[in-house]
Amino acid sequence: DCHKEYDEHKTVEKYNDMLNLKKKLLKSSNAKTDLSHNMIENELFDVVKKISSLATDNDALSKCEPLSYNVMSIKEKIPFNNLLCNDVEGLVSSYFLYIKDLFKSLDNASFEAIASSFKHSYCQAVRQQLDQEDIFETLVQWVKKKTQCANSVARIIVSYFIQNCDVYGKLSR
């Protein structure tokens, strides 16, 4: 029915809408394909497990010190999407220090390898000319696929790397 409706009542506007949707889906598919080849460091699996355990461990977050923002704000990193910005700010406010402590327990080289893989994946998504929300969702799907974690955990981890300037930060040339 949809195809028949489109064929019989096609307008330039409907055609352009369909073309733009196709281009957006193609970009998203290309970005996911690019990221599917990127590896996740083994140490990230431990972090994923500990974040996942927060569902039953009420005390873990209360041990963290209050968050202090002294870096580029999330609003500066995500200026054109208030919903995404608010979502990321909430996740960062709740989990950033906890995850930072988890990463402190790793040796510096392991953390740098994980951060580099996020930066590399982010750059690949940017190359596909995805908008910020599509980049966020592509990275979330990448983390989920590579670590087999829940969507909520993947969103927390990607938000951490946004605050940590590995995603949406200024890219050096």
State the predicted function of each range.
Residues 9-12, 49-59, 145-151, 168-173:
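Hydrophobic transmembrane alpha-helix bundles
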Residues 4-46:
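Polybasic, low-complexity binding patches
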Residues 36-79:
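Short flanking/linker segments adjacent to small metal-binding domains or redox-active Cys/His motifs
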Residues 30-33, 52, 56-59, 107, ...:
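Residue-level signal for secondary-structure boundary elements
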Residues 64-173:
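C-terminal, charged low-complexity interaction regions
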Residues 1:
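Short HxH-centered metal-ligating active-site micro-motif
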